[in-house]
Amino acid sequence: MPVVRLSQAFVPTLKEAPADAQVASHKLLVRAGFIRQLGAGIYDYLPLAKRTLAKIEAIVREEMDAIGGQEFYLPALHPAEIWKESGRWEVMGDNMFRLKDRKNGDYCLGMTHEEIFTAIARDELRSYRQLPQVWYQIQTKFRDEPRPKSGLLRVRQFTMKDAYSFDVDRAGLDKSYEDQRRAYERIFTRCGLDFVAVQAHSGAMGGSESSEFMVRTDAGEDLVAACPRCRYAANTETATSRLASEQDGAGLPKPEKFATPGVVTIEALEQPPYGVAARRQLKTLVYVADEKLVVAVVRGDQELNEAKLQTATGAQVIRPAHPEEIPSLMGARAGSLGAVGFSRAKVFVDPSLADRKDMVTGANEDGFHLRGVEVRRDVLTGPHATVAELRTVRAGEGCPRCDGTLDVFKALEVGHIFKLGTKYSESMKATVLDADGKAVPIVMGSYGIGVERIMAAAIELHHDELGIRWPPAIAPFQATVLTLGPEPELKKAADELVKALSDAGLEVLHDDREERAGVKFKDADLVGIPLRISVGKKGLAEGKVEWKLRGDKAVELVPLAEVARRAAEHVRAGR
């Protein structure tokens, strides 16, 4: 194996992290000389990062090929027409980088490649006999992220492995999806990640089912609800829970209006003279779903989950209504809104409210509320009212599958798999002839992995106050040899040891710089190569060198003649 000499290598380590770096992976990747920032959400990957990313990509390729994947490399520049076929040209909104060529043609930089792969399938696949197919690529993607931050965790240019399965029916899709799920588990395990697969929201991708692969870390921006008893786990965008039952009063024969001047918040209605607990209030919110106003109702002490509302509405895009949009629909401003007897728009009510009585809500008249509201009688009888999961689950609520209690924690998404079904094949007219000679839409799946996110997630999980502690399979080198002095005999012994390690098949970084031992030790800990072997004057006098594993405090003296064999065995054991 080739040897890299640190005296000749480009590894620009730093003593301090950038002032704007907040998460460990960002701080350490910059300090250890792996990345540099070019612009907001745009990073240079330096030689050490390129080595680690190449190892991650190799693992991904091995596991994709093992399930019959065939690798492609498709353009990052896409004509607008193909995105318009699927309807996503408008859906992607400002997240998509768009540009025009010199002939004023519309193009975009690809965020993902469902449309492109579907077009190939449409043009080339004719019969069910050609299915199943599993196609993938490892390629650069672009997203006009509004708030790039956290180093490689939220960027505008990134590398993704995106795979696509093509089957003749749902049973085939189920098998392809399961193959991908198992492959993802192997990939993340080999990369040293502690992960959990969770139920997820499909979002703009669409489809009937999706799962995310999450790494538990405070650097994550997603929230996962999980039950330690039965292993239930879901992104809070889809998670459900059991709530403790509420004891409502007898209520009133019909809602009764009462004056609440100046009361426009849940908290204000809790105060005297009203004293209405938040759990007895109906929170009524107005949203715009695909340019149509809709109403969502959750309990006063609960939070609306926008992803769940998007699922309930079936909309491609949702947003909170602007204050000026609300009065024309509701007859009042925010703070006095309610859905009693409301029929001017679709109304979605969280199931935890369906059987509640004696509730309080806005009267759709500024300065007034209604008491004695019975949700099923007064809200759900509306012509456009329906029950739908809307609220965000919280830690301590009951598990929906067993009598356990949910934990809610931050997590980082490193992979996402989708059952797309016929969403793209129908809109783009990608069909094959089935066994009966009938044209049927191809049934598709989509499967993504963030390559740089694996690298960053590994650091979030494996680091200490000294630096990175790379999982062996994705470390930039397997061993580093430190020459601890200028003496010719030390240099000669180190050179011979490095050659022996290389001949034994190890990837070695040789720190042969004219630097103090303390500097070399600090850089070795910072860069995080799993095995450190130090050639010093004292040990060499006894025919030995120092052997230390990154993360272990113990330093062992090992006979020089045994080091190469022992190191090779150590690497083969995956340590």
Swiss-Prot record:
GO terms for biological process: prolyl-tRNA aminoacylation. It is found in: Cytoplasm. Its EC number is 6.1.1.15. It holds the Pfam family tRNA-synt_2b. The keyword Iron does not apply. InterPro entries: aa-tRNA-synt_IIb, aa-tRNA-synth_II, aa-tRNA-synth_II/BPL/LPL, Anticodon-bd, Anticodon-bd_dom_sf, Pro-tRNA-ligase_IIa, Pro-tRNA-synth_IIa_bac-type, Pro-tRNA-Synthase_IIa_type1. GO terms for molecular function: aminoacyl-tRNA deacylase activity; ATP binding; proline-tRNA ligase activity. Disulfide bonds: none annotated. Its main location: cytoplasm. The keyword Plastid does not apply. GO terms for cellular component: cytosol. It is an enzyme of class 6 (ligase). It catalyses: tRNA(Pro) + L-proline + ATP = L-prolyl-tRNA(Pro) + AMP + diphosphate. PANTHER family: MITOCHONDRIAL RIBOSOME PROTEIN L39/PROLYL-TRNA LIGASE FAMILY MEMBER, PROLINE--TRNA LIGASE. Catalyzes the attachment of proline to tRNA(Pro) in a two-step reaction: proline is first activated by ATP to form Pro-AMP and then transferred to the acceptor end of tRNA(Pro). As ProRS can inadvertently accommodate and process non-cognate amino acids such as alanine and cysteine, to avoid such errors it has two additional distinct editing activities against alanine. One activity is designated as 'pretransfer' editing and involves the tRNA(Pro)-independent hydrolysis of activated Ala-AMP. Belongs to the class-II aminoacyl-tRNA synthetase family. ProS type 1 subfamily. Homodimer. Consists of three domains: the N-terminal catalytic domain, the editing domain and the C-terminal anticodon-binding domain. This is Proline--tRNA ligase. It comes from Anaeromyxobacter sp. (strain Fw109-5). The gene is proS.
